[in-house]
Amino acid sequence: MDKIEFTIRRAQANDYEAVSRIYSGRAVWGTLQLPIPSADMWRKRLAEPPEGAFSLLACVENEVIGHLGLFTLPNNPRRRHVGQIGMAVRDDWQGKGVGTALMQAAVDLADKWLNLRRLELEVYIDNGPAFRLYEKFGFTIEGTLVDYAFRDGHYVDTYMMARPRK
């Protein structure tokens, strides 16, 4: 099988429908995102991102197949060095390297351009594929957040993971 080449680019306001489709997929139910978001919510979020927010897209040709948000804390003097990550990959592209490409782009942006010393994220403890992806990029578990989120009718635990840059 040939290696798939992904293009990583910044999201634009007119990408809102494609991003909304990603977060409407069943795979998102395994993340901390609310399923079935409105396209209008994504239109507003991409048109007017908060200060310090970076929205990256993974594309094959011109098709958007993954999204990663990297959120910095520029107005918090004690946490300016921190970035928080959330991501999702379209259902039909799961397990094909999209998450790896997005994480590599986020780590490069954080390390080489934003001078962030710490990246953080939360992941459901039963989301093995995501957990292994984050470990591959140097993230480690810093704690378990008990009953952290409500999913599919139950409270579930998440891991708090971080990647401090040495």
Question: What are the functions of these language-model segments?
Answer:
Residues 57, 69, 84-88, 97, ...:
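Conserved beta-strand segments that form the floor/walls of ligand-binding pockets within enzyme
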Residues 95-109, 131-136:
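Conserved acetyl-CoA-binding loop-helix of GNAT-fold acetyltransferases
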Residues 111-122:
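Conserved GNAT acetyl-CoA-binding A-motif
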Residues 120-123, 135, 140-156:
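Conserved catalytic-core motifs of GNAT/GCN5-like acyltransferases
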